[in-house]
Amino acid sequence: MSIIWVLVGMALMGLIVWFTMPLLMLVKHKSKLSYDETVTALSETFKKKEDWRVLAVNDYQKTTEPFVKLERIASINFCNPRHASKILTDDKNRYVTAFMPMGLGVYEDKKGQVFISILNFGLLGKMFGGTISEVMGKAGNEVTEVIKSVSTN
């Protein structure tokens, strides 16, 4: 009988993880600025931070225009080569290039409110452990500082 309760407990834990992980992995912040001001402020703040680079700003409203009319929506791709080099010097860590460069989303909803969405890099890094965890945790904290400069929360 106790094995049944163990299995029930495992099933419940699995369901809890299944439903809470998306809420933990993706974080949404409301911007106190307009859409254009948010994209500009985030890009400029990254450029001013030591060792950070903005690699691209992708305008999805423009890109998807032939297919659908969207509100304003973009992603900003950024990188810190110093942090990246700490991960990439070890061959066994190079598979995480699938998560590089880092990025965040900026979008305007149908009500005109502007939001920033981002992966929880610290939590993501913990899934890998070691150097990846250490570096992604530090990078995630630095990215959070940038977002706080335009966020209401």
Where are these regions (language model features)?
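Feature marks short, highly hydrophobic, charge-poor N-terminal signal-anchor/signal peptide-like helices
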Residues: 1-9
